[in-house]
Amino acid sequence: LQIMIANYHTHTWRCRHADGTEREYVERAIEGGLKILGFSDHSPYPFPDGYDSGMRMRLDQVEGYVDTVLALKKEYDKDIEIHLGLETEYFPRFWDQLIDFLSDYPFEYFVLGQHSLGNEIEKILYSGHGTTDGSYLKQYVDQCLAGIDTGKYLYLAHPDLFLFNGDEA
């Protein structure tokens, strides 16, 4: 039996598709025997024209997220090691704006979780829908590699999310 001692990939209520507060995550992690808990809620993106994503926290929620995680890190420092991160896609068109915005906060790590080709508002394909088109798989890999090449990401999360169902040749 292997016991997981660390989890660096967690999402809270702020991303709008997960449940639970940060405190609930910490308490469950301690109960489950985790030694390290990394928060990596879905990062906001500074999309134009007031576009509001339904799958990530809003820009105005970042400060509350950071303050909450840092307070829990201090409160539970004898019980569990807590880290502050974000899961974010690599959208080249908006990347510099995002990094500039996030640089005001003490994030320890970013997880690359690429959910769309192109970007969320001009998406070519949402990765969870699957495809048999090999050119989309190549674009997905190229976009992930470009994100990794920024040097900002700790790791690539769920690369299988793309759901390529085409010829494996």
Question: What do the predicted segments below correspond to?
Answer:
Residues 50, 97, 123-124:
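Short aromatic-enriched loop/helix-cap "lid" or pocket-rim segments at secondary-structure transitions
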Residues 1-92, 155, 162-169:
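An N-terminally biased module of ancient metal coordination in phosphate/nucleic-acid-related enzymes
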Residues 16, 104-107, 111-169:
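Domain-core and long-helix interface of multi-subunit machines
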Residues 61-65, 69, 95-103, 136-141, ...:
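Charged, low-complexity, helix-prone segments enriched in Lys/Glu/Asp/Gln
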Residues 21-35, 93-107, 139-152:
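Short amphipathic alpha-helices and their capping/turn segments at secondary-structure boundaries
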Residues 55-57, 100, 128-129:
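Short, hinge-like loop/turn segments at secondary-structure boundaries
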